[in-house]
Amino acid sequence: MSARTAPRPQVLLLPLLLVLLAAAPAASKGCVCKDKGQCFCDGAKGEKGEKGFPGPPGSPGQKGFTGPEGLPGPQGPKGFPGLPGLTGSKGVRGISGLPGFSGSPGLPGTPGNTGPYGLVGVPGCSGSKGEQGFPGLPGTLGYPGIPGAAGLKGQKGAPAKEEDIELDAKGDPGLPGAPGPQGLPGPPGFPGPVGPPGPPGFFGFPGAMGPRGPKGHMGERVIGHKGERGVKGLTGPPGPPGTVIVTLTGPDNRTDLKGEKGDKGAMGEPGPPGPSGLPGESYGSEKGAPGDPGLQGKPGKDGVPGFPGSEGVKGNRGFPGLMGEDGIKGQKGDIGPPGFRGPTEYYDTYQEKGDEGTPGPPGPRGARGPQGPSGPPGVPGSPGSSRPGLRGAPGWPGLKGSKGERGRPGKDAMGTPGSPGCAGSPGLPGSPGPPGPPGDIVFRKGPPGDHGLPGYLGSPGIPGVDGPKGEPGLLCTQCPYIPGPPGLPGLPGLHGVKGIPGRQGAAGLKGSPGSPGNTGLPGFPGFPGAQGDPGLKGEKGETLQPEGQVGVPGDPGLRGQPGRKGLDGIPGTPGVKGLPGPKGELALSGEKGDQGPPGDPGSPGSPGPAGPAGPPGYGPQGEPGLQGTQGVPGAPGPPGEAGPRGELSVSTPVPGPPGPPGPPGHPGPQGPPGIPGSLGKCGDPGLPGPDGEPGIPGIGFPGPPGPKGDQGFPGTKGSLGCPGKMGEPGLPGKPGLPGAKGEPAVAMPGGPGTPGFPGERGNSGEHGEIGLPGLPGLPGTPGNEGLDGPRGDPGQPGPPGEQGPPGRCIEGPRGAQGLPGLNGLKGQQGRRGKTGPKGDPGIPGLDRSGFPGETGSPGIPGHQGEMGPLGQRGYPGNPGILGPPGEDGVIGMMGFPGAIGPPGPPGNPGTPGQRGSPGIPGVKGQRGTPGAKGEQGDKGNPGPSEISHVIGDKGEPGLKGFAGNPGEKGNRGVPGMPGLKGLKGLPGPAGPPGPRGDLGSTGNPGEPGLRGIPGSMGNMGMPGSKGKRGTLGFPGRAGRPGLPGIHGLQGDKGEPGYSEGTRPGPPGPTGDPGLPGDMGKKGEMGQPGPPGHLGPAGPEGAPGSPGSPGLPGKPGPHGDLGFKGIKGLLGPPGIRGPPGLPGFPGSPGPMGIRGDQGRDGIPGPAGEKGETGLLRAPPGPRGNPGAQGAKGDRGAPGFPGLPGRKGAMGDAGPRGPTGIEGFPGPPGLPGAIIPGQTGNRGPPGSRGSPGAPGPPGPPGSHVIGIKGDKGSMGHPGPKGPPGTAGDMGPPGRLGAPGTPGLPGPRGDPGFQGFPGVKGEKGNPGFLGSIGPPGPIGPKGPPGVRGDPGTLKIISLPGSPGPPGTPGEPGMQGEPGPPGPPGNLGPCGPRGKPGKDGKPGTPGPAGEKGNKGSKGEPGPAGSDGLPGLKGKRGDSGSPATWTTRGFVFTRHSQTTAIPSCPEGTVPLYSGFSFLFVQGNQRAHGQDLGTLGSCLQRFTTMPFLFCNVNDVCNFASRNDYSYWLSTPALMPMNMAPITGRALEPYISRCTVCEGPAIAIAVHSQTTDIPPCPHGWISLWKGFSFIMFTSAGSEGTGQALASPGSCLEEFRASPFLECHGRGTCNYYSNSYSFWLASLNPERMFRKPIPSTVKAGELEKIISRCQVCMKKRH
């Protein structure tokens, strides 16, 4: 019995002995009875016979009466102890215990969270009216009142007296005027200066204990060392005595109860000798025989690599070496016939162990395995030597330390002046600092400013108050008449009433041509005008003096010369959309023609009629124009109205000549600031300024940590601090680099170790019987030819072979008319290639095919190939068609506030307003406060068009060109139309066997056969001989092109690739596309012919018809590049081809017009509750300015104030806003060179880009470096020469049991097997013809996940190599972050006209316009009210039969959206949602239903609500679980958040099928078949249950398609949290159906541990099936 099989219970059968009873006949001696009445028996009486055999037992008699009760028997002997009884059944539940004592009162609970704010209370009642307030303070004087209406005309003054005439006598002062009315209260004063800071307040009391924080996150999985085994515990106390009930069975099947325990018996007789005792402890020196091997233990966990042992003693001389090098590899043999189908294997840990095979040859060295888990802690090492280590990488910046003590005073070191630095780029504008101290007031007057531009006209002032009445005038009797100087021009008169419009005047004379304007944007082409009459050019008129009368209009002049190019006109309105023209012929794209000569100028159109007057424009005020030339004096105006009579004036002397220049006047007021100067040269560096105040922190993310600063000077020793708290244990560190290899130690033999603890007693093995030596085996028959070795590397392409003999040409049937092809260009004759050498004849293959050998182990990975040369740059692709619109993106985060934009360009010049009448100068007012920001102006008219040129009409066809040079080799053409299928040729001789093909995909199930009667299992038959070849069938007719195929099912998992290192191999050559053949119709299934023998080769047949298109050949070598041909003739237009393949994406179009400002985004979700702020934290940064308030109503106009006196000097005002950045000032004077104080340490800078390689450094010092790490394993060396024979070694110890002998000879072939199952799907047919382009298909399913690659050894970074060759230009990157502001550029060109300003004051009402044209159709109106109920309609037609839809979900377990299986349609796609856990309770989704496919992903897809009508989202320790993808987690296993989660979440598709879908599970590693009448949708692994946090989870119904996942993963789902993170956690488990051996159904399961790589062999397989529609 094998040691691995469980012992079976043996049943002892007691044989029954059947005794045949023979009756012995009695001996008769001479007694004859003749008659019935007389018998004469003479002779003596015989002796008594022997006792006969007992007769057979009689039938049992009737049951007797119960006998009387017997006397009690004597006390029996003491019985043997009985066997332990069976375990009794579970007892009845006990009575509930008494209630326990009351517990001690609990500790007081922590204070609860602060409750939410209560609802707004009901408004209170209005209060009672208050008492009368105190009278207010008297107001300030009001402004002067509005001047009253003009009074009545005064009385005429008294006549002047004739006596005492005085000239220039001044009248008496008038009476004081009446006091004005009360003025309005004055404006509030300016705010006072900022007061000094108050004294610091006292420290506050400690705050109340904060609320209890939310439940913490799940802890990280810490992988520690496994602890050492504990010491065996002490022996426990003795258990309670067991009760033994012994039932004695007496004779007559009566049950006697056992009596009381008897007295102790007397000493018994000495017993027989006992069995031999256990062997005693051996104190001798001999070693016992080796015991039998024990049972196989569980596979242990991988151990830790031990420390390297000390160097061993030099070994003895080795045995002679192996055979020499292997010979050259033989040629590849013929492929063997396919083997029989093997039996289904089950993964069973309990299979019996077979005979041990012969040891195989040592395999090649495997790839380096993954790093094992950490071993137990090693022996403490010897103390290491202390050497200073290399400088570590800069650490992260630490927390800000407390302020240090005041440093020692520094030394006054005078540094040498530095060389002047270059001008730095202007820095970013700093944030505004605090207000500075008030500056000194200097009354120095500045130099006079430049002449300012003329100011705008002031608004008319208010008429002044009437002056006092004048003195009566003097009577002038004999005054000489001297005319006074001409008076000032009078005020313009009031506007007259609008006159009647005059008739249309005659056309004026044509003006002289203007100076050419700037080149304008091209306008839209105008419509051609009608031909005008040519006019004669008139003479240029002279400038008439303004006194002349307007002459009669002259005759039209002669036609003038065409004027210079005028300014561009305003773009015309777009014309009406024209009718579509006739469809043009499809032209071949011609070469771009040369630019034609400029066309003749068109004839000028006649002037159109004058349009109606437009409304006055509301343009903004334009920039002031250039100063005009002096105008001609105007015509004399109409005589003014008589002015009031002037007072009599004495003759004024005529003004004399100008006097000498006067003394210099007082300095004038400070002029306006001048125009900024040009940029000065780079000045000398200024002195370092003092430290500025810390600015307001800007809006930005914290920068990366800066590099480590230089070491500071050592500070003074601080005072001793308080002892700190015990720190938290740190996170486990990353494994350190391997240490330097130690020096070999001197090996000393160690002393005897301490005796170990006694081990646990092992299971006793069974003793096997010593077998007899076996007979020597028969010599084996020679083995069959081995199978092919692995496919070799592709060889170099050989030279082209010689030209074969010409084939025989038989005319085939005429093909159908092909489509006319395009005219090809005539190529030049190529050069003749060289003839290659004739190949050697091949070695003839053997007649017999070998049996297939076992799959060889994978070979040693080849050397890493070098990177291939860069390919030539491809031709640019055609622009692609526009892809479908992408899905709406997620709302982005709110952007940061932008910087202040530059000032806008000046507006368009406005039309000049009408001149106002001059007002009386008003009183100078005080400077007003800045007004509120006005409302946004209306949207401007559209700007000038950006269409750079208009497409002209189609040109005439060009002249015939010259013949072109032959063109370069074109791109690969589109596959041609499929040819007709040729007749099938006679079978050729057998070709050489091809390489082993890939495993085909599973074929579709055949039509169901009739249900056969199950036969009994026959014996295995002998393999039959090969049958004859069947006759050829007739070729089927060519089928029509098939529809595009659906996506194929997912192929089998590929073999694992070899690790090739990190560099990719060179790209293989591209194969030529094969010609697609026609897809034939499906032929009828032929009757299976009997298998025939391979007949002899027949005579050579007649040449066959042309064969079907061959398989695609290997790519031929590239030909030499031909010369570029001359341009060919333009061919006739071809027939319109089928639609082309989609091109590459087109280049981005020009930037569109900026769209309107979008609406505000949806408010984002509320953020998490922040942590409690620090006590006495510094004030936060300054907030952004608030939103602009609504514009207030316009106030009533104020009254003018009296001119005030000059006020006292006010306090210093607050600092104004930062102005626009000025131009750089002129270079300053050179400063004194005094070293400034060292500034505070700057913030850490961002990491710089790597610099260019530096110059070679100086030679290093000759210092012996530290011993380097052990190098990686080298390639195995060639086999060495045999060594010399060694000395004879001492006799060895008793060896271990030897390996089993070589395998015996190959057995006879078995009996004929059962017929195999239906074969797999055949090779795919030839390609069908190209169908019309289908719609853009869905994204294909992802490929099967490959086996995990080998572990890459991450090496430390080496020193930077020399700069590589420049790479190909990369793809366009995403826009980078905004850079710092650049230097101030030069002044730009004059800007375009600005947008329209605010509308001016409304003009007079215009005349009624004409009726407008019909407008565009308006937008759809809102839904109307529901109409009245209609009449009952006619009865409808009978309903059509509709298919019932059954919905299921398919999960890809990758980031690709899965496709629906054939015969089903997708409804929508989403993300694979597994289950949620809320309030420590889990609820899951069936993965086969549409509830497991959510269309939006979030780490917290649910919220919870309570009875208070309050809902909380993402604010508790709840979880959600999603199916994951095979994407690898980061090395540090940090949680993933944000956009980085996308590659980890599985995608899914909800599909609708015509019938229900179920899952079938095999509980073996074989994929189960679908039931009869069902079709397969997909195959997978049986997934049953999952649990995670708190051991909560749910499961899948095994009938649901969700229980059959297409990929197996030990961790198939991610755990996500409300805080936005996801990760894999160690307490997440997945449960799968196991693979079972049917022979072990009712046996105890054997515990086993299966490691990665073997997992898929123990998982049950399954298949999802859907019922067919008949």
UniProtKB/Swiss-Prot annotation:
There is a cross-link at residue 1651 (S-Lysyl-methionine sulfilimine (Lys-Met) (interchain with M-1533)). This is Collagen alpha-3(IV) chain. Residues 29-42 are annotated as: 7S domain. A motif (Cell attachment site) lies at residues 791-793, 996-998, 1154-1156, 1306-1308, 1345-1347, 1432-1434. It is found in: Secreted, Extracellular space, Extracellular matrix, Basement membrane. InterPro entries: Collagen (IPR008160), Collagen_IV_NC (IPR001442), Collagen_IV_NC_sf (IPR036954), Collagen_Structural_Proteins (IPR050938), CTDL_fold (IPR016187). Type IV collagen is the major structural component of glomerular basement membranes (GBM), forming a 'chicken-wire' meshwork together with laminins, proteoglycans and entactin/nidogen. Tumstatin, a cleavage fragment corresponding to the collagen alpha 3(IV) NC1 domain, possesses both anti-angiogenic and anti-tumor cell activity; these two anti-tumor properties may be regulated via RGD-independent ITGB3-mediated mechanisms. Changing residue 631 to V: In ATS3B; likely pathogenic. Residues 1-28 form the signal peptide. Gene3D superfamilies: Collagen IV, non-collagenous. Belongs to the type IV collagen family. One of its GO terms (molecular function) is integrin binding. Keywords: Alport syndrome, Basement membrane, Cell adhesion, Collagen, Deafness, Disease variant, Disulfide bond, Extracellular matrix, Glycoprotein, Hydroxylation, Phosphoprotein, Repeat, Secreted, Signal. The epitopes recognized by the Goodpasture autoantibodies are sequestered within the NC1 hexamer of the type IV collagen network.
